[in-house]
Amino acid sequence: TLTVTPPEGGSGAETVYTFKLTVLPTLKTVTFAEEGLEQNVAFAPETLNYTLKVPDSVTALTPTVTTTLTDGSVNVTYSPDLESGKIPLDKLENGKFTITVSDAETGAVKTVYTYTVERIGTYDAKITTNAVGAQVRVYQGDTLVTPGKNGVYSLRTDKSYRYVVVAKGYVTKTGTISQPALNKAGELTVTLSAVPAISLPKYDAFWPNFRGNDQNMAITSVKTPTGQIDAETESSDVELLWASASGSGYDSGAVGSPIFVGGYMYAYAGTRLLKLDPATGETVASANMASNSDFAIIPPTYADGMIFVALKEGRVQAFRADDLTSLWVYQDPLKGQSNSPITYSDGYVYVGFWNGESGAANFVCLTADYEGTSAKEALWRYTSQGGFYWAGAYANDKYVVVGTDDGQSGYTSQTAKLVVFDKRTGEIVDSKESYTGDIRSNIAYADGRVYFTSKGGYFYSEVLGDNGKLSGSKSINLGGMSTSTPVVYNGRAYVGVSG
């Protein structure tokens, strides 16, 4: 109400004006459950007209709406009427449907949202190949398209698509998909050729990777140098054999941790891969890498005559171990820091990347094959929020196991995961999400169990079954964060803890 009162001494009576306000009802959100829809603009309560592209394989739309008023004072109606909660597209008038929100009392105050439907042609496509165990991926731009039942893709006639077919022992093939290229069964046959035969060196490897063996246990019988220390002068009779300034600084320009293969020591510094004589420190051979590493922390990995290095921006590069000729470079589409050790198993390369505490990053499987070209495609990829940092994988003859970051800042979230994959297909065999803080250690293996630590300050162990399932969880609160890979030896476990 508004009351008008005459001034003191004035004439006239007090006047009261009464206003009745009616809030214009509007929708707050509108979504549809069907996939493959494209709306011209994002929904906004004040925008009343929209264009919606709908694949012709979709026969009805399933709307979910919310209103700005939530006290039951409004009604929502559809034209045409809903049938089993769906808007029937065969009953549209002039290709349009409306959603009306009105006051529940009279229905006189209302807002009408109009959607114009544009039907888009679709077709089914399936890619077949001669390569056993091949992985097929289809992209629309940079977006991965998910296949339906039996590997059949539902594609749109107004979009362009490309395929990638990768298989162990074969040269990767990429190309475009179009409806005219399919046979009568709706299939596109992609024939892969065998990788070219090359002769690689066969070296014995004393210490081929970060942890020295496939179990990531870092156990050795080699003795450290010994000598006498003079108590008065504090001098030692142990002599420095050699020192080589192969790098500079303390970041990616520094010399990384070495591996020992075929009587040589391999390391990298800056953008150079180095092959060194361990007796003299002399550089026997060197090669340019595609970039430098992120922090020169993780050593290279050797296997089957090849040296593998993890580099900046989500890269992995492979070299011949004898003359350091580059064989191929992988570039991950999500990029990221390459701070995790590379795991090699049966001709497959596994490594993860990191894009910040909550950023999405990939764990990838690559075939080690030289394909006659420098570019390498992943056999399969797994994306995780928080990614992989210092997280080396364990692989056996069937499975590969890796730990993830928790996807959040701090060290108290119980959202870090231990994931078991089929090592060849990338299918998730088992996964647990109950670990406190980032898992930033290698996954170590001994006697049927995997061992790892977390930044939340725990030492964990799980049984890894022959079927790839995890069970028999055990944990110990260490009292401080840990990124140390455990060692299990002679009935005891050894692990480092932050002070």
What label would you give each PLM region?
Residues 26-28, 83-85, 113, 121-123, ...:
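Cysteine-rich, disulfide-stabilized extracellular repeat modules
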Residues 203-211, 249-273, 291-317, 334-364, ...:
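Repeat-blade elements of multi-bladed beta-propeller folds
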Residues 196-254, 266, 277, 282-292, ...:
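Aromatic (tryptophan-biased) beta-strands that constitute blades/sheets of beta-rich domains
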Residues 1-124, 130-132, 168-176, 182, ...:
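Beta-rich interaction/scaffold domains
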